[in-house]
């Protein structure tokens, strides 16, 4: 359906623009990570990885959840309700956005560690999985199935291989801890999405005012949710200590 593809392009324009901003910010990390790799021990490097991965999860899950609940209200204000996509398509688009970005830190570490040969075959594997799943899922879910296929193929290849070799060859550690953490983060993001969905049921304001109110309410609610989940954890305290130390050094 040509009109459906046209409607989808409005969403991908917004998502790709946000992705470009976030990717540009993250690209600056690669040189920093590379220099840090050379100046510290594997254990210190591993600790820094965990801090950066935690921070990236907070930023990317926040952006993804906000995108999920605000992109339709934004499109409605911008182009009108006639240009809105099925919620399942929106979910599939945002999931593809999230699975791409959540691998930023493992991918950056793999690059700076020079682990290229180990993952050279995975793009081909990912392409075959993507094609197969796209055919199957498109028949079941339509357009959203294609985006779900992209997310699944990416998770089964790039997201697995990058972290596996970074942990196995870069840190000399078992990668199972990373995958456990990734699963926990996914569940936290999922329940955060459910939490914001429940809140969204009580906000009936439409238009530009509604968009602004939703942005404020959802943002405060989601950041409060993350704080409640993480504030007693080791990774939160360690990250807070690191940021506080960096700010103190600047002063």
Task: Please state what every model-predicted region is.
Residues 1-16, 84-88:
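Interfacial/gating helices of multi-pass transporter permease domains
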Residues 8-27, 59-63, 93-103, 157-160:
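Transmembrane helix-bundle signature of multi-pass secondary active exporters and lipid flippases
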Residues 11, 15-53, 107-112:
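Helix-loop junctions and terminal segments of transmembrane helices
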Residues 12, 48, 53-68, 144-169, ...:
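Short alpha-helical transmembrane segments in multi-pass integral membrane proteins
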Residues 22, 46-100, 131-135, 139, ...:
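Alpha-helical transmembrane segments of multi-pass membrane transport and lipid-handling proteins
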Residues 94-126:
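Membrane-interface junctions at transmembrane-helix termini in multi-pass inner-membrane proteins
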Residues 117, 124-159, 173-176, 194-216:
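Membrane-interface helix-loop junctions in multi-pass transport and translocation proteins
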Residues 196-251:
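Membrane-proximal transmembrane or re-entrant/amphipathic helices at the cytosolic face
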């Amino acid at each position: 359906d040509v009109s459906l593809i046209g409607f989808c392009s409005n969403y991908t324009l917004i998502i790709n623009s946000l992705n470009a901003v976030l990717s540009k910010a993250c690209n600056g990390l690669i040189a920093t990570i590379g220099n840090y790799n050379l100046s510290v021990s594997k254990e210190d490097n591993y600790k820094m990885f965990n801090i950066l991965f935690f921070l990236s999860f907070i930023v990317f899950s926040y952006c993804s959840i906000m995108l999920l609940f605000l992109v339709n209200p934004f499109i409605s204000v911008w182009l009108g309700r006639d240009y809105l996509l099925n919620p399942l398509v929106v979910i599939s688009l945002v999931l593809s956005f999230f699975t791409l970005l959540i691998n930023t830190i493992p991918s950056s570490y793999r690059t700076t560690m020079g682990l290229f040969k180990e993952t050279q075959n995975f793009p081909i594997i990912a392409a075959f999985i993507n094609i197969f799943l796209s055919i199957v899922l498109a028949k079941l879910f339509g357009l959203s199935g294609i985006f779900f296929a992209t997310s699944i193929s990416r998770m089964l290849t790039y997201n697995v291989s990058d972290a596996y070799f970074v942990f196995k060859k870069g840190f000399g550690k078992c990668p199972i801890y990373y995958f456990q953490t990734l699963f926990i983060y996914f569940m936290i993001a999922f329940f955060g999405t459910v939490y914001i969905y429940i809140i969204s049921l009580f906000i009936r304001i439409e238009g530009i005012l509604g968009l602004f109110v939703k942005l404020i309410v959802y943002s405060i609610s989601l950041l409060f949710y993350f704080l409640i989940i993480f504030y007693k954890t080791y990774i939160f305290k360690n990250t807070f200590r690191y940021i506080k130390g960096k700010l103190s050094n600047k002063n």
